[in-house]
Amino acid sequence: MLKLRDIRKTRGEGPQRYSLVVPRLDLRPGQRLALVGPSGSGKSTLLDLLALVLSPDPGGVFECRADDRTLDVAGLWRSGRQDVLAGLRSRVMGYVLQTGGLLGFLDVQRNIGLSRALLGLPADATVGRLAEQLEIADQLHKLPAALSVGQRQRVSIARALAHGPSIVLADEPTASLDPLNAERVMQLLVAQAEERGVCILVATHDEALARRAGLQ
């Protein structure tokens, strides 16, 4: 689905300047991967590159296989094709942020269904089924402010999966949770991705938690 060869991203200025270099990376259906490292090691930068929200430096190969065709992502960035990149992001990617990233004025049901609505997908049983599987079915009509941090993360996971993406990226999804909730949320995230045959890449500083969840 994603193929990267010799991709580089340089950020910052002066003493804060650094370059992230990706010699080789392939993301394929069904993979369950962990990106482990301390804060500031470039995990979020790599996720933003993979999520097509951050442009790579010139050079290298960056391809995305979607809709039975291979697209040159690096070329799309160079030519300014933000429309094509946005379409790829909305169809192919699901993203779980560290803080959930929910819209406070929408209830849980509409937050989960937002990714489907933006793609014009029909309202079906998907939202309710995900809510049941992620143990938040009794929270559907509440606003995010009324939820615990763990519940908000489960809503974010449901939203990332609701439109049937090929790849789910999660940036420190358990960093703000207590150990018990972190364990449960990580297990639910991996289980739901596995059930759908989705490629999942989780950035985390907790290698032991990632291993217990079955991430490689």
Sequence positions of predicted segments:
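Conserved ABC ATPase "signature" region
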Residues: 124-139
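A short, proline-enriched helix->beta-strand linker immediately N-terminal to the Walker B motif
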Residues: 162-166
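Conserved ABC ATPase signature
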Residues: 143-153
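Hydrophobic anchor residue at the start of the ABC signature
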Residues: 157
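Catalytic Walker B motif of ABC-type/P-loop ATPase nucleotide-binding domains
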Residues: 168-171
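Helix N-cap at the start of a conserved alpha-helix in ABC-type nucleotide-binding domains
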Residues: 179-181
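ABC ATPase NBD coupling module
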Residues: 69-94
